[in-house]
């Protein structure tokens, strides 16, 4: 009988560290709910002590996610653990994940400590975390470069202190699969109380071996794998969860383990993470790349037509990728749009049907036919922009030519006011952005601009993703239209609204902190 491998997702913690712009609470919650729907066992959603925003994100997700265990990260520091527990206490059950470095290099140069002191600190902090929850995970940072006997001492002590999960990270992606599997086997041989904990692994992809190392560890007895969707993360990224999950499914014959993941949600979750995080998926990416199931060789095409298993070890349908695209027109009613969304696996809570249908009709009038990929793109934008907007694009016009300086006129709704400005720029998009800067006086600096087609043909929707710098913080914006200049304008307005919301959140957090301080003085 096969054993279960626990899937621990760290997209919203380790994965987010790689992003050019921080995610909003709403964006993090949207990803968390998708991960819950996909069936991850544990999701690590933040580092609460790092900022008030991270604390709020962890608390919000812990309050709303019910079918996955929510986890927060904490160093082996009292305040970290206390703040993590405070952010998580709204959940029925939660996990605290605490860590400390164990390699000689980290202990000597980073911690300026000794192995004995590290073990003493680990024991104390695991016990402190156990005061808040029975579910405590302990990580030996840089375990991949820690001598096996030292590692075994730390692991044994952490288990005795009450850690239920012991995580063995290859923090810098240094080890080879046969080497990393040997570390796990070595721990099973050396740690007498190892049967009292689940052994977990957290691998990085610096040498492109994150997934290989994770699978080698599973083969050696690890029963939890940590990683991120699409492999996002610091430097070269984390172990790619969807690759590990599908490798376990496809090669169950040799690994003899399984997960409780709903595989049909992999594709949609991957796409959502890509869009929200503004990190495009390479076409040749395993499992979820656009070319992962493409066959261009004549020999391969002939073989697939005769029997798909000749060249496909898994099907697109097994990850939820429906290759049959159905089209709707402007004559299609609301019920038809809702029915198609239902067939694609969307719940009514994931989009506003009224707003989606209005956007669908406008697009159908322009394109004639609206395909599944159009609907999914509209639903994504619909979800991103469903919050009240302080700024709204009312009108824009651009004059530009090969020998002319681009000039843009923009009208922007700012709260209850309508403001208008005109500006010149280096092309139509820059002219619009200069006009918007004049209206808002925000002085936003564009850091990154990318355009992607959502669909095929000259009338495909164009999605513009931008990253902008404002007052030392980076904000992400997205816009969607058949006109890329309009998409660009909408993306900048999305940035404006994200800046405004961030300021409102900061005001609210300051108000709460002040009230808390006032209450202390009263007592």
Curated annotation (Swiss-Prot):
Organism domain of life: Bacteria
InterPro entries per the UniProt record, alphabetical: 2-IPM_HCS-like, 2-isopropylmalate_synth_dimer, AIPM/Hcit_synth_CS, Aldolase_TIM, LeuA/HCS_post-cat, LeuA_allosteric_dom_sf, LeuA_bact_synth, PYR_CT
Subcellular location: Cytoplasm
SUPFAM superfamilies registered for this protein in UniProt: 2-isopropylmalate synthase LeuA, allosteric (dimerisation) domain, Aldolase
GO BP term (any one): L-leucine biosynthetic process
Record keywords: Amino-acid biosynthesis, Branched-chain amino acid biosynthesis, Cytoplasm, Leucine biosynthesis, Manganese, Metal-binding, Transferase
Manganese is among the record's keywords: yes
UniProt catalytic activity: 3-methyl-2-oxobutanoate + acetyl-CoA + H2O = (2S)-2-isopropylmalate + CoA + H(+)
Cofactor(s) the record lists: Mn(2+)
Spans annotated as Regulatory domain: 392-523
Pathway membership, UniProt: Amino-acid biosynthesis; L-leucine biosynthesis; L-leucine from 3-methyl-2-oxobutanoate: step 1/4
Record-annotated Pyruvate carboxyltransferase domain positions: 5-267
GO CC term (a single one): cytosol
Record-level Gene Ontology MF annotations: 2-isopropylmalate synthase activity; acetyl-CoA C-acetyltransferase activity; manganese ion binding
EC assignment: 2.3.3.13
Family per record: Belongs to the alpha-IPM synthase/homocitrate synthase family. LeuA type 1 subfamily.
Subunit structure: Homodimer.
NCBIfam families per UniProt: leuA_bact, PRK00915.1-1, PRK00915.1-3
Function (record text): Catalyzes the condensation of the acetyl group of acetyl-CoA with 3-methyl-2-oxobutanoate (2-ketoisovalerate) to form 3-carboxy-3-hydroxy-4-methylpentanoate (2-isopropylmalate).
Protein name listed in UniProt: 2-isopropylmalate synthase
Organism whose genome encodes this protein: Citrobacter koseri (strain ATCC BAA-895 / CDC 4225-83 / SGSC4696)
């Amino acid at each position: 009988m096969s054993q279960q491998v626990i899937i621990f997702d760290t997209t919203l913690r380790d994965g987010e560290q790689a992003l050019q712009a921080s995610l909003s609470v709403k964006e993090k919650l949207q990803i968390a709910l998708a991960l819950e729907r996909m069936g991850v066992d544990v999701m690590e959603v933040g580092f609460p002590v790092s900022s008030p925003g991270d604390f709020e994100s962890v608390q919000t997700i812990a309050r709303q996610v019910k079918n996955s265990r929510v986890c927060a990260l904490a160093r082996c520091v009292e305040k970290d653990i206390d703040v993590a527990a405070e952010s998580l206490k709204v959940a029925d059950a939660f996990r605290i994940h605490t860590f400390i470095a164990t390699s000689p290099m980290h202990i000597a140069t980073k911690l300026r400590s000794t192995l004995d002191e590290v073990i003493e600190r680990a024991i104390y902090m695991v016990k402190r975390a156990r005061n808040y929850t029975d579910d405590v995970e302990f990580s030996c940072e840089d375990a991949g470069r820690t001598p096996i006997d030292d590692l075994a001492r730390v692991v044994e002590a952490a288990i005795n202190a009450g850690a239920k999960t012991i995580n063995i990270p290859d923090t810098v992606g240094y080890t080879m699969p046969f080497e990393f599997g040997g570390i796990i086997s070595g721990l099973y041989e050396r740690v007498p109380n190892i049967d009292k904990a689940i052994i977990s692994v957290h691998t990085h992809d610096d040498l492109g071996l994150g997934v290989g190392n994770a699978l080698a560890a599973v083969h050696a007895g690890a029963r939890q794998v940590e990683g991120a969707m699409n492999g996002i993360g610091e430097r070269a990224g984390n172990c790619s969860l969807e690759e590990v999950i599908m490798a376990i499914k496809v090669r169950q014959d040799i690994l003899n383990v399984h997960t409780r993941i709903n595989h049909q949600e992999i594709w949609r979750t991957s796409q959502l993470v890509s869009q929200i995080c503004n990190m495009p998926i390479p076409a040749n990416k395993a499992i979820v790349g656009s070319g992962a199931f493409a066959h261009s060789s004549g020999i391969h095409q002939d073989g697939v037509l005769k029997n798909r298993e000749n060249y496909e070890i898994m099907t697109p349908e097994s990850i939820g990728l429906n290759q049959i695209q159905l089209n709707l027109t402007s004559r299609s009613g609301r019920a038809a749009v809702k029915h198609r969304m239902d067939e694609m696996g969307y719940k009514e809570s994931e989009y506003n049907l009224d707003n989606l249908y209005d956007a669908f009709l406008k697009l159908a009038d322009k394109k004639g036919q609206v395909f599944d990929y159009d609907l999914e793109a509209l639903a994504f934008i619909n979800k991103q922009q469903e919050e009240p907007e302080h700024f709204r694009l009312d009108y824009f016009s651009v004059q530009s030519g090969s020998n002319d300086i681009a000039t843009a006129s923009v009208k922007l709704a700012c709260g209850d006011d309508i403001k208008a400005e005109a500006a010149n720029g280096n092309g139509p998009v820059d002219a619009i952005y200069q006009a918007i800067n004049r209206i808002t006086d925000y002085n936003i600096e564009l850091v990154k601009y990318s355009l992607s087609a959502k669909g095929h043909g000259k009338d495909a929707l164009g999605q513009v993703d931008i990253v902008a710098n404002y007052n030392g913080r980076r904000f992400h914006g997205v816009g969607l239209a058949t006109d890329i200049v309009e998409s660009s304008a909408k993306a900048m307005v999305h940035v404006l609204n994200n800046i405004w919301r961030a300021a409102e959140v900061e005001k609210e957090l300051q108000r709460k902190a002040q009230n808390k301080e006032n209450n202390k003085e009263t007592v």
